[in-house]
């Protein structure tokens, strides 16, 4: 019985701590959500532009190398 409790007790403690964490968490309000969404969108746009310019630079370089 001790061996069974040795495996069950950490799981029980984890579930108890997880439930406590979820109860303490709160949903972001509308203003906070919009701020996070805007920051994420700006990040995506910046990464897209960086990828576009890298591709734009590598196309002529690739044509020079392959065209030779």
Curated annotation (Swiss-Prot):
<dbReference type="Pfam" id="PF00584">
    <property type="entry name" value="SecE"/>
</dbReference>
<keyword id="KW-0472">Membrane</keyword>
<comment type="function">
    <text>Component of SEC61 channel-forming translocon complex that mediates transport of signal peptide-containing precursor polypeptides across the endoplasmic reticulum (ER). Forms a ribosome receptor and a gated pore in the ER membrane, both functions required for cotranslational translocation of nascent polypeptides.</text>
</comment>
<dbReference type="GO" id="GO:0043022">
    <property type="term" value="F:ribosome binding"/>
</dbReference>
<feature type="topological domain" description="Cytoplasmic">
    <location>
        <begin position="1"/>
        <end position="32"/>
    </location>
</feature>
<keyword id="KW-0256">Endoplasmic reticulum</keyword>
<comment type="subunit">
    <text>The SEC61 channel-forming translocon complex consists of channel-forming core components SEC61A1, SEC61B and SEC61G and different auxiliary components such as SEC62 and SEC63. The SEC61 channel associates with the multi-pass translocon (MPT) complex.</text>
</comment>
<keyword id="KW-0811">Translocation</keyword>
<dbReference type="InterPro" id="IPR008158">
    <property type="entry name" value="Translocase_Sec61-g"/>
</dbReference>
<keyword id="KW-0653">Protein transport</keyword>
<keyword id="KW-0813">Transport</keyword>
<feature type="transmembrane region" description="Helical">
    <location>
        <begin position="33"/>
        <end position="61"/>
    </location>
</feature>
<keyword id="KW-1133">Transmembrane helix</keyword>
<dbReference type="GO" id="GO:0045047">
    <property type="term" value="P:protein targeting to ER"/>
</dbReference>
<dbReference type="GO" id="GO:0071261">
    <property type="term" value="C:Ssh1 translocon complex"/>
</dbReference>
<keyword id="KW-0812">Transmembrane</keyword>
<dbReference type="InterPro" id="IPR023391">
    <property type="entry name" value="Prot_translocase_SecE_dom_sf"/>
</dbReference>
<dbReference type="GO" id="GO:0008320">
    <property type="term" value="F:protein transmembrane transporter activity"/>
</dbReference>
<comment type="similarity">
    <text>Belongs to the SecE/SEC61-gamma family.</text>
</comment>
<protein>
    <recommendedName>
        <fullName>Protein transport protein Sec61 subunit gamma</fullName>
    </recommendedName>
</protein>
<dbReference type="GO" id="GO:0031204">
    <property type="term" value="P:post-translational protein targeting to membrane, translocation"/>
</dbReference>
<feature type="topological domain" description="Extracellular">
    <location>
        <begin position="62"/>
        <end position="68"/>
    </location>
</feature>
<dbReference type="InterPro" id="IPR001901">
    <property type="entry name" value="Translocase_SecE/Sec61-g"/>
</dbReference>
């Amino acid at each position: 019985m001790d061996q069974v409790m040795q495996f069950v007790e950490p799981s029980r403690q984890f579930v108890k701590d997880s439930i406590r964490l979820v109860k303490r968490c709160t949903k972001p309000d509308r203003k906070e959500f919009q701020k996070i969404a805007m920051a994420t969108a700006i990040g995506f746009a910046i990464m897209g532009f960086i990828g576009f310019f890298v591709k734009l630079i590598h196309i002529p370089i690739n044509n020079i190398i392959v065209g030779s």
